Amino acid sequence: MYSMKNYQLLAFLLFSSQILGQPFIGQREITNYEKKKYNAGTQNWQIQQDKQGRMYFANNEGVLSFDGNYWELYPLPNKTIVWSIEMANNKLFVGGQDEIGYLSPNDGGQLVFHSLKSLLDESDQKFADIWNIVHVGEDIFFRSISRLFKLNKGKMKVYQPSSTWFFLGKFQNKVIAHDETRGIMMYKNGNWEVFIKKQDLPENFYITSISDYTQGSSIITTSKNGLFQLTEEGIKPLTIKGVNNNQHFTSVVKIDEFNYILGTYNNGLYLFNEKNEVIESFSKQEGLQNNNLRSLYVDKSKNIWMGLNNGISFIPFNNAIKDINPVNFGDGSGYSMAVHKNHMYFASSNGTFELPFENKKDLSYLKNDLTNISEGQTWKLGILNNQLYAGKEDGLYQIENKNAKVVDKKSGYWIFETLSNKQNIVVTGSYEQVRLFDHNEGQLKDIGNIKSFAGSARFLATDADQNIWISHPYRGVYKINLKDSSTKLYTSDQGLPSTLNNHVYKIKNKVLIATERGIFEYNEVNDRFEMSSYYKKIYGDKSVRYLKEDVLGNIWFVQDKNLGVIDLSGPKPSIVYIPELNGNILSGFENVYSYDKYNTFIGGQKGFYQINFEKYKENINPLKIFIRNVKIKGDVDSVLFGGYHGDINEEQSLSNIGNAKVAYQLNSFHFEYVSPFFEQQTNLEYSYRLKGFDKTWSDWNKKTEKDYTNLSTGYYVFEVKARNNLNNESPVTSYIFQVLPPWYFNIWSITFYGILLFILIYLLYKLQAKKYSKRYQEQQKELELKHQIELEKTDKELIQLKNEKLETEIEFKNSELASSAMNLVQKKEFILKIKETLQHLNKSEKESMDSQDLKKLLRSLSEEEKLNDEWEQFSIHFNNVHGDFLIKLSEKYPILKAHELKLSAYLRMNLTSKEIAQLMSISVRGVEISRYRLRKKLNIPTETNLFQFLFEI
């Protein structure tokens, strides 16, 4: 016991002798996640990671998960604190307050808590807090103060302590536990055996964590007794140089065979090596949220996760970029750097700083022993003929060790270069002019300024023809030839894209102009500037602000405030962007200093940044991407897929996930996706497409979510991929789903519609058939009618023809009747002549008629007889022509006499009264009287036309 106290005192003295503060100039980047960021409890007690890369934290409010972009909380059913978590057997086992169980995905890919309390007897279900969970093989062990539980194949076994179980952990893949009265126990063959007796342990010994250490041993941290090394032979104190052992240690984790991290209750985090030497320390001063570390974890990419008393912090251990911003800099901006004669120098807005130089592989591990040797703005550091010079706001200085000697104070100096073919001639650009110096015997002698140029010369370069090229911010580019003292201004008239924003640099012994439209070169033959054909293939016509060649021949550049490198180490040039520094470099005063292939320094807004470019390229792990969430958007969003395809800790398929079928009215979707590349989230871009909707992949962008709304019925595959700044792409991950037809278009509806359509078609067919039949019948009737009409028309025409013929015949008969009537008239006249003759004879003086006269008379009488025969013939013809008119008339009116029948016949022939009078040998008056009498016999009203009456008989 005495030796233990001596050890503690020695450790305290060793610690007290250490220099407090930042030990090295370089500092790793720290990312802090505050409580308001992850929206859960304050404290985080344990940390785990699954094979997909997601992180899990035992949090005061539940199990907290993080995938690089999204946080999600899984509270326990009883809403209590989660003290412990352990990834085992493809499940995340969880220990809380009076709760024990595991998280595992359901069929929808969402994590669901499954309680294991039902496996315990009722008497064992009140166990308070589960502080530790460990597993070996299929055995899962849980520790509460009063019990140890072992889960194996769905069965739970309970182990009681002699008094209290203080700790549970693993030593060389064996389960150990600290029993308050018996000491450290080891689980062997189903039993707990004493491994380290209590009397061999320090007083008030309380283990807080254990981790693998050197081969066959482990490191133990305690709350009061410092650090210990545990082996099969026993336990002994362990000292870490630079660490006070007399403090509360909370956790220790092995990073690799050379590096370890150690968490404390009040002093932050230590990083130490296999030699037990502190390499780095991290506290609130270096950027942690607080110094109280509850848990530590090293993920698969060697990143360090810290569960703090308030929040979560993250350090990318293998990050190739470090901050160079010691407290001495006072957050001054970094403008230039140089290494000269075992000294490293920094030019900043706060002065010129010197640091003793050791040739290390990683210069960020140079000890923080900075000295400000010259206060005030320093623009440029450069070595001329093995002498270091500094261009400052108040003049040109020569630097030697920790001293700054004035060379010229006529003006502030931006830049200085030697002539390519005359190394002793130094060309300087100042605030007001270009001034020449002769470098001789380690001293600069002022030769004088160039009279043909006046103005600020911040950017200049020289070539082998003794030309000095100066770019002016708004005039163009000047060429000053020292041979003939000529000066010429080049503008857009001489090939430059503009007189604005031209910057001259010398790359690979060639003068180049970085412009708003790409890189331009000088064509000496044409005395013009032309776009460089070589750089056009790389940059195109994009704006370039800065160019610098490193020791390997790679070309660093700044484009739209973004830093990049033309990597020439491969078979063809490739561009590598450094997005981690976007917005952090010193815009307008960009500076890159390349010391060797492991150390490149970039001027920043606060200090500098160191990049190990070789490591930067090597650190790019194969990219993974997964779809973490698929939601159906609506009045209330519902999760369709929760991001887990299979068990929580198994390698999961990235393609053809899902195959969900979604109702038509739920046809708007929200997709979330992420690549759990924690150390380089700023380097990632994503591209997606929805097969069945998008024709092409989207442009690369930083978004990690995508919405699709009002999708039509059909099958869809959402695909997404990631790429980093090295243009490495991840495999494509995909999610399949189907938007079902609306209810009125589902299979049953379609079947019903088919049947209904068949019925409708049948009915339509019948209707059409009936319609066609009716139309056919109508057409037949119409044809028959037309035929009938045609027949009737034909009949009418025949009748008309017959009538016309009859009329013709009637006219002919009437003509004959008229002729007959005329003959009768003539004969009547003839009779009158006979009468006259007889009267004449009667008056003749001759008393007797001679035979000749008698014969003549007889002959006339014979003709009279013939006349009567002709009337009979006339009657017959008249009846034939006029439909037996006389017969019908005599039958209808038998009272009519012969002369009245004749009168009727003549009237029927529509003869005039005069003509009738002649035929009937009466006067016209007599005809009228006869007509009157005839009307009376026929009983014809006065208003009836006699001819019309007779015509209708």
Regions found by a protein language model. Give the residues of each.
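Helix-turn-helix DNA-binding segment
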Residues: K866, E872-S930, Q948-F951
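Loop/turn residues immediately N-terminal
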Residues: N60-L64, D98-G101, S146-F149, E180-I184, ...
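Short loop/turn segments that connect beta-strands within beta-propeller blades
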Residues: D67-Y70, P105-G108, N152-K155, K188-N191, ...
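Residue-level "micro-hotspots" composed of small/polar
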Residues: G21-Q49, L76-V82, Y102-D129, S163, ...
